[in-house]
Swiss-Prot record:
Organism in which the protein naturally occurs: Oryza sativa subsp. japonica
Record text on subunit structure and interactions: Homodimer and heterodimers.
PANTHER family documented for this protein: CASP-LIKE PROTEIN 4A4, CASP-LIKE PROTEIN 4C1
Stated family: Belongs to the Casparian strip membrane proteins (CASP) family.
Coiled-coil ranges (or none): none
Entry protein name: CASP-like protein 4C1
Cellular localization per UniProt: Cell membrane
Length: 182
């Protein structure tokens, strides 16, 4: 038997399906970005922590502390993103989760960048002291710190996009294209 639903209702249902698929894709991208920031932050903290000579310098201690903090935050965000991908809902109420993510991404991204920049300046002078492997290990920690910042910055851009979608449409998913030909 033919369905009694109107073509407009069918088009609305199709648009809703596209909107959900776009939201799932964006949540999946967010999960990958959060996982990348976690991996880079943990690796940068590990390299900074195992370099005893570099830890005598305050910028490397700052790099270690900042990346450890970013790693803890990223672990929480990986769990929240996995929860969202698996269940389709956020841990916190939607508006609160979006503002939490956007604000903390900005703050922790800046902290990661500041720490990597401070340690990079110190690492640049390391070669003149004849540090050898300690200098190489410090350079790797700085590079991983910058990579961690890049991942947090990309996640901040994506969370900013989700927040803008929420403010514009009332949903964290991007608006679906209209089925109207006009």
């Amino acid at each position: 038997m033919p369905s009694s639903s109107s073509p407009a209702a069918a088009a609305a249902g199709e648009g809703s399906g596209r909107k959900k698929a776009a939201g799932r894709r964006l949540a999946g991208v967010m999960l990958l970005l959060r996982l990348a920031s976690l991996c880079f932050a943990v690796a940068a903290a590990a390299f900074a922590a195992t370099d005893g000579a570099a830890l005598r310098a305050a910028p490397f201690r700052f790099l270690l502390a900042a990346n450890a903090i970013v790693a803890v935050y990223s672990a929480f965000e990986v769990a929240a993103a996995a929860w969202e991908v698996a269940g389709g809902a956020t841990l916190l109420p939607e508006a609160m989760q979006l503002w939490f993510d956007f604000g903390h991404d900005q703050g922790f991204g800046y902290m990661a960048l500041a720490a990597a920049a401070a340690a990079a300046r110190e690492a640049a002078t390391c070669g003149s002291h004849g540090g050898g492997t300690a200098c190489v290990q410090g350079d790797i920690a700085v590079g991983l710190g910058f990579a961690g910042f890049a991942a947090v910055a990309a996640a901040a851009a994506a969370s900013g996009y989700r927040l803008a979608c929420f403010l514009a449409t009332g949903s964290r998913s991007p608006a679906s294209p209209s089925s109207s030909p006009y």
